[in-house]
Amino acid sequence: TIISSTNYSKSINKSPVRLQKSTGNCLYQERILLYMNYDSVPLRDFKELNDWETVIFVYQSALKQVETKIDILNGEFQHRHKYNPIEHVKSRIKTPESIIKKLKRHGYESSIENMVRYVNDIAGIRISCSFTSDIYLIADMISKQNDLTILARRDYMKNPKKSGYRSYHMLVTTPVFLSDSIIDTKVEIQIRTVAQDFWATLEHKMHYKFEGDGPDYITKELRECARYVAELDTRMEELNNEIQKYGKLSDKK
């Protein structure tokens, strides 16, 4: 049976899969309950906590699968070309607080069905690379994986956000094989240079510090810094190309 992510909550209700309550899962449940009590979100909106637990388990499994795939692709590239396009890979599962806030911000009730349908970045992977050309190289390698389905792409490299944010986003689904079913699960992949990642981390902190409404002078300064980062990436790319040309000429001698 192949289950679409849009019918996720229905399939999980029917699934006999249940996780043993480990310390980590108990802490996760406590965070959900604490936040729900604090924000007056009724418990009935989440159905059973066991369902939530199973959903998170499936997203964690999807994250592991995509991470492993990226690691293999990077290793293969090193094996064939003696070069690693990927510098760092980070992954995370969105916290219950963030999921609930995002649903409320977009006017949706806090339910498992809405969570799965409308929150595309519950499972997220961030890939940092040295050069802008690596971004498209990595995106191309990921796109060629037959067991991944590309749902959407957003090229903020060519079309930066107003804030100055630059990155390349891919929304994919990967099949998670359970004992009695296959669940197509969404994972968001962000690819950017190390310099862009440094800038984005600072911008992200400011966004949440000021709840998206920071002082004008800070916003302006960040936008200016984003321009410098873009210029730096361009110069480093050009310098790398010159180094590669020099290396090829040296090999011929």
Please state what every model-predicted region is.
Residues 84-122:
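A glycine-rich, hydrophobic loop/mini-helix early in the fold
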